[in-house]
Amino acid sequence: MKTWLLALYDVLSRYKNVWNETWKIRKQLDSPVREKDENEFLPAHLELIETPVSNAPRFVSYSIMLFLTLAIIVSIFSNVEIIATASGKFALSGRSKEIKPIENSLVKHIFVKEGEYVKKGELLLKLTALGAEADTLKTKTSLSQAKLEEFRYKSLLEAVEKDQLPILDFSKIDLPFMTENDQKRVTLLIEEQFSTWQKQRHQKTLNLNKKEAEKLSYLARIKKYEGLINTEQVRLDDFRALYKEHAIAKHTVLDEENKYQDAINELEVYKASLMQVENEVLLAKEEQELVTQLFKNDILDKLKQATDNVNLLTFELDKNNQRQQVSEIRAPVSGTVQQLKVHTIDGVVTTAETLMVVVPEEDSLEVTALIQNKDIGFVKEGQEVVIKVEAFPYTRYGYLTGKVKNITLDAIEHPKLGLVFNTIIELDKKTLSTEEKEIPLSAGMEITAEIKTGMRSVISYLLSPLEESIDKSLRER
């Protein structure tokens, strides 16, 4: 081990001594310094050896290395923006108001023109729902008849309670479709029904009077026989006294007893008949009252039906009136009429068909854009956005700035882009500025929105393809 170290030490010492000696005579080893013209007169091989090399290649190589070093340093410390691109258009924050009918209708009047300014509540169109006028007329006629029936039964009920025909005042009821014939018909019906009730009640009264007379007749007979029985009782007592004195025969006493017993039997018969007649009198009174009660009950039932019918038809008329009111289409907001599709009087419009669009005047302009599914994970509310208008090249007219205001939570199906998310972008400025003038923007213009989702270094951007290739290639199958 020591021999190996000694040998190594000797070798290094030898090289050190050689280097020191060479260093001492280094200037003697250099070629003599000659001028440029002196080198030109040397032999060719010596001229090539003695002439110094040009500094240009060295300068170029140093410059390239310096540039690469600076580029690497800049790429490490410099950042670029990460952009998510979305296509969209300008829209009003309140959204344009679509005007649609609620049912199939005919156009009666058109009060506006394309591009006309309208105020809130101003009449735009007047429509007539198919069959609405006929339904309204039919309902009004039926309601008039129902109210007339209600009036008839109320008057008839009043007549029964007062037991006299009322004075009919048709002016108390509002019946625009009532004719003079209707009044005569109602009056005649009331008189006929009242007369029929009076006749029925009169028949029951006559029957009651008859039963009352029979009752009085039986009472008189009972009173007569009660007196006769008393007389026969006295006569029988006298005959019995005479018989005890043997003044008369026994047959005479027996005949008198038979008369007395017959009188008692007749009295019992009349009393039984009286009880029957009294029951018949009570029944006749009940029948008399029942005629009136049944008649009133029938009137009350008919009156209830008429009242229910009036209420039902009134509701139906209100519904028809609402249909006609809805047929008068008014402006929901103040704004400008656009996309007017109705131009023909008596033309047919269908349910939920867009007849026109009213663009509000006071709503602020904003951007609605569609964010692709691959970018939605990086887009957040409040991020800065650059908006480039398709109609005005941004290299000449510039661009707008804004911020992400809202992002929908659910994706929508787009025929070309697939599943996308709708977002609303709030603008910082509503016009494009040029040296000449301010260019106003309107709803419907197409735009391209560049949403700033973050920052990344340049070196990371340049190396990302390499990283991706390495990640894909260095995998075990």
Curated annotation (Swiss-Prot):
Domain of life of the source: Bacteria
Record has RNA-binding as a keyword: no
Protein's cellular compartments: Cell inner membrane
Gene3D superfamilies: 2.40.30.170, 2.40.50.100
Cellular component aspect of the GO annotation: plasma membrane
NCBIfam families attached to this UniProt entry: type_I_hlyD (TIGR01843)
Name of protein: Leukotoxin export protein LtxD
Provenance organism: Aggregatibacter actinomycetemcomitans
